[in-house]
């Protein structure tokens, strides 16, 4: 694929120690059961959805703007349209403990445009971030190891993470896509229209919450286009 030929952009020390501490402190407050998911049978890879209710952007706006900036720059550098919609699909906090990793060398972040990974802790062993380069798994541990380091890459570039052998590997993962900013408690698969999960949760919560959740889950751009079409038809 085209993405496989693109380089990973490494940003050593993109975030300061204070910014990393802000992210970790914020992540520690995000404890609602619906926004936490184990991605392994033995709980060695736990993901918390920090974008739930759009909290990451609202609570950490300056950090969000910095990370979106490097993501958009990568998008444009690889031929993307700067005027294209480029919104946060998901913000995830990953904690991987010994035995865990992301082992599929063919893994991609399907449906997204650009992914940003930020290292939040250096107190672990193993867990090297790798990408496939001409069929070989290349480690980026030399540039993506210290807290505040970031790697930015096209989401369809194949990547994986070696097994963690000691400590806890803590990483912030942001994915940007050509869709609306999502606030649902998962990695949304719908770039258009209302999120099925958000609407389903609203139904379970009760009719009083349904309307607000439904309209919050809608794609604002599609709503604007529909309203404009109605006005033209009048």
Model feature map: region roles:
Residues 2, 6-9, 26, 54, ...:
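Residue-level detector of intrinsically disordered, flexible termini
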Residues 1-85, 193, 199:
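Non-heme Fe(II)/2-oxoglutarate
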């Amino acid at each position: 694929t085209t993405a496989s030929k693109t380089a990973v952009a490494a940003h050593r020390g993109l975030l300061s120690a204070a910014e990393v501490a802000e992210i970790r402190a914020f992540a520690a407050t995000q404890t609602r059961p619906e926004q936490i998911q184990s991605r392994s049978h033995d709980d060695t890879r736990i993901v918390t959805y920090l974008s739930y209710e759009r909290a990451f952007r609202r609570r950490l706006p300056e950090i969000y703007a910095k990370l979106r900036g490097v993501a958009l720059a990568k998008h444009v550098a690889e031929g993307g349209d700067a005027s294209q919609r480029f919104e946060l699909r998901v913000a995830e906090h990953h904690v991987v403990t010994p035995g865990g990793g992301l082992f599929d060398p063919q893994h991609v972040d399907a449906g997204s445009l650009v992914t940003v990974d930020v290292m939040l802790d250096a107190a672990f062993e193993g867990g090297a971030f790798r990408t496939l380069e001409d069929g070989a798994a290349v480690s980026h541990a030399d540039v993506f190891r210290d807290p505040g380091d970031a790697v930015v890459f096209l989401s369809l570039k194949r990547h994986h993470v070696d097994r963690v052998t000691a400590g806890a590997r803590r990483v912030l993962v942001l994915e940007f896509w050509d869709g609306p900013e999502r606030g649902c408690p998962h990695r949304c698969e719908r770039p258009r229209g209302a999120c099925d999960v958000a609407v389903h949760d609203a139904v379970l919560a009760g009719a009083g919450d349904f309307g607000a959740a439904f309209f919050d889950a809608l794609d604002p751009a599609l709503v604007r286009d529909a309203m404009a079409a109605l006005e033209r038809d009048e």
